[in-house]
Amino acid sequence: MSTLSFCVADVGFTLNFTDIPDARYLLPSYAPFFVKSLSNDERIMNMIVGNDCETYSSENEFVGDFDCGDSFYTISKDSNGEYKILISNSQREPACALRANADFSKCKATLFGDESMQRFGLGNAIMVAFAFSAAKYGILLMHASVTE
């Protein structure tokens, strides 16, 4: 398993890859935020990323479909309070299946498609998980598209 740690807005998160020895090529825009390691106290979110970490099942309580223009999210919640999110591109081709506990501090993700789709899926999964896990710390994630 390879681990990448990042520090954004003075808080950290860790990605653990079960099948990729060095996944930095999937996250070029995160390069300025890479740190060598984080303590558990510094980390607000941990995500395990692997080929068989998560599947998306429609058997859970449906929360909603969200069309965000270039991305589409299908969200459900299971009986344990965990969220399951299928992240797709604008053509509704799956890029990532994400499962998160209630506060998004622990996540698992499986990526789909070619390298471009995997970058898209992982980037969106990190953005969603970071936004929800950081909320309880008073951190607001603002997408670059709203600052123009």
Where on the chain are the PLM-derived regions?
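A noncatalytic interaction/capping subdomain that flanks phosphate/NTP-handling catalytic cores
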Residues: 1-146
